[in-house]
Amino acid sequence: MDVNIFHFLFTKTNPGENFSCPKCKILIYDFDKVSEVYQCKNGSWACKNCWIEIFRTTKECPTKECRVESIDSLSRSRFIENGFAGKNMDCPNSLVRSNPNHYEGINVLLDDDGCRDVVTVGNLSSHLKGCIYAFTKCPNDVNGCTGEFRLKNLDQHLQTCGFQLEDCPNCNNKIIRKSIEEHIDEECLKTKIKCLECGSTVERGDMDFHLDNVCPNIVIPCILCDNGCDLLFKRSELSNHLQSIEHISNLNNKIDELNETLNDLQISELNQKVEQLETLLTQARDDPLAQREINRLISKQEKFKSVWDIKNFSKRQFQKGFYFSSPVITVGHHSFHLWLYPNGETSPSNSLSLYLVLTKGEKTFVNFSISIKNHNGNDLNSTFENDKCLEVGGTRWGWAFEKDFKTGGYLKNDTLSIQFTVAIKKQPLITDILSVQ
C-alpha cells in the first residue's frame, strides 16, 4: 500500500509534520505497521533506515548535538511510535480507486459503498485482514474475467460472471458460461445433430463413424471390389447387389482373368525347368556331376510365394464367421486358398483367424508360412516348420492372432497385406528314378 494514502485518511488534522521522520520526511509507517523509531541520548529521533545511513556516514544525530556509533547507543522512541499508533484513521477501503494499481492522492475519492469504520493506525493491519470492503479480483481471471470488486459484492458477481465454469448439459465438460451455447451448437461431441445424407439423428462425435459404416445413403464400393467387382451403389442396396447377376458376373470374369494369368506364369516356369532337366538328363547317365545337379533341382520343394492384399479393411463391418477367401494358390497339381476370419470363426473373442485350405488335388503334405506386414517394422510372422497333411474337405491348418489389425501400423492406405509361402513335400530324387530304369 502506498504510504501517501495516509495524508488523505486521517480523520482530523494531518499528522504528517509530527510523525514524519525529521531526516527523510517520510511518514513512520512501514507497509502494514508503524516503523521502528530510535532516538539519541539528547532525544533527537529518526526512523531506523535513516540511523543506518548515519552510522555509515556522519555518525552524528540529526540535530548534530551528539555522536553515535551504532544502534546499541540508541533507544526506541516509544513515545513517538505509540503516539502515532494511537491516531484514528479511516479504513483505506472507504475510497474509490480510479486507478486500481495505486493509491496516489490524485486518484482516490470517497465511496458511498466503501467501509465506514474508523480504526487506529496500530490496528489497521488486523482490520484490513477481515474487511469485507477490500477490493479483490474475480477468481475467474484465469478464464479471462478482468473485473475487480469489493469482497462483499463478489458472490453476486459470480452468479452472473460470463467466465464462470459450468458443466455442459450434454458432455459434462467444464465450459465458461458465456461460451456454453456456442460449445453446444458447434463443438460438443455429445450434441445430437442430423445426418445430411439420411436425416437420422446422431451424436456429433459419432457422425464420421455413421457416415463411414452405417448411413444407408452413402455411395460405397462393393465389399469384393478387390476381387473384380467395381460397381458403386448406396449402402442400403448392398444386400440386393450381392445377389445380382451383374455382381456375380464381375467376380467370375475376374477369377477367370486371374487364373489365366496364373496359368501362364506357371507354364512358363515349368517349361524352363523341363528344358533344364532334359539337358541334364542327356548327360546324367555318364556324368556324375550332372546327376547330382538333377538331384539338387528335383529335391527342391515345389512352392508358391505371393502377397494377398485386402483393401478397405477398416471400413468394413464383419459378423462372426464371415471370411475372406484369397485368389487361388496353385502349386503343382494342387489348388489352395487362404481363408481369413476378421473376427474369428467360432471363438467368442475378436481374434483374427487365418487358415490354409486345400480346394483341389490329392491329399498332400505341405510346409507353409505367413507374414502380416507391419509398416512400423514389426511384421507378424508365423511358420509351420513340419509337414502338415491337407486334403479337400478335411483338415485345415492356421493361426489365431489376438491383435487389433485396424491400428498399430498394419494398414497402409487401408490395406492389409499378407505375405505367404506354400511348399509341397519333397519329390523322389533322380537317383531313385534312374535305378528303376
Curated annotation (Swiss-Prot):
Record's note on what induces expression: Up-regulated by Pseudomonas aeruginosa, PAO1 strain and down-regulated by PA14 strain infection.
Residue span(s) of domain MATH: 303-422
Keywords: Coiled coil, Cytoplasm, Metal-binding, Repeat, Zinc, Zinc-finger
GO cellular component terms given for this protein: cytoplasm
Coiled coil regions in record: 240-287
Zinc finger (TRAF-type): 126-181, 182-239
Pfam family, one: MATH_2
Localization annotation: Cytoplasm
Major subcellular location class: cytoplasm
CDD domains given in the database record: MATH
Function: Probable adapter protein and signal transducer that links members of the tumor necrosis factor receptor family to different signaling pathways by association with the receptor cytoplasmic domain and kinases.
Family: Belongs to the TNF receptor-associated factor family.
Domain notes: The MATH/TRAF domain binds to receptor cytoplasmic domains.
Name by which UniProt lists this protein: TNF receptor-associated factor family protein DDB_G0293202
Organism per entry: Dictyostelium discoideum (Social amoeba)
